[in-house]
């Protein structure tokens, strides 16, 4: 089963509303679809969605890398030897995790379709047939709009992730308190700071974090502030998750050794694909650190891969964020994600178990705009 072609398709995709987190405002998304075909006609799909919070890659650089590095390296090689193919890529690509993630996903999809089994089976087997997901309430300067969004999403999700860090600490905490007052004591709340606080900000916030009843504090401090975050973990009675500070398996090892978090977010794009994400999750679990699966708000292909990854993990400490296609105006798969009882089903079809809409890819191709 030789690889016959590797293509990159940049998309002009947009969100239903502006999504704000950290220092980023996103109304459009730089997705790139990677399509790999074999000489016997099997096709697999992957998706890159490079965002500046995690990588220097751009939509244009992903396309260039696929065309000038990935395709020449993979075409003519045996697709069934996935790990050796990833090792081949590691030799020709420098730090390009989102590009590698798309290729890794496409190879897994291709192999699953060829074998007639779901990707979760290729990752070792599925521990669950559905994955709990959480709502995501984007940051807004107006607390009333934050509350409105939280109440709307509370109708669907048990857990809500809120965002803070863009404003003065007390004003951000006032927004979180307003949400708590609106949704009531039974809603499960987590907050993502995206590394926007300094150590003094985090210390100031400790008492109010407890009073608001937040259960998870994600990436309170920026990468590089691990000694301070270790102290924060020791002082807080709730979980602290590492996200931006875990961009490799080695980073997961560092979290375990230094105890700078009690949970690791193993988003597959930032880590360089499902293979690396699975390894990071295994490292964390072996070291007594919890695991959650996040995303960078990808479309249907990467989200389907995330569901298979989450299904293949024995223990998930928190709900996953894997229904982000619902945030988009456009869809690229025939199947639409359905959230039922705060869960999303994992497809049991071959490969990713999705049908990619080639007409939609042609329509959204940024090169045709």
Task: For the regions a language model picked out, list residue spans one by one.
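Shared catalytic-loop signature of beta/alpha-barrel
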Residues: 207, 213, 224-239, 246-343
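Conserved, mostly hydrophobic/aromatic
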Residues: 3, 34, 41, 70, ...
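Structured beta-strand/loop patches that form or line metal/cofactor-binding pockets in enzymes
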Residues: 1-40, 45-53, 325-330
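Metal- or metallocofactor-binding catalytic centers and their adjacent structured scaffolds
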Residues: 37-114
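Metal-dependent enolase-superfamily TIM-barrel catalytic cores that perform enediolate-based chemistry
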Residues: 124-236
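C-terminal extensions of enzymes
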Residues: 327-369
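Glycine-rich phosphate/pyrophosphate-binding beta-alpha loops
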Residues: 14, 48-56, 95, 136-140, ...
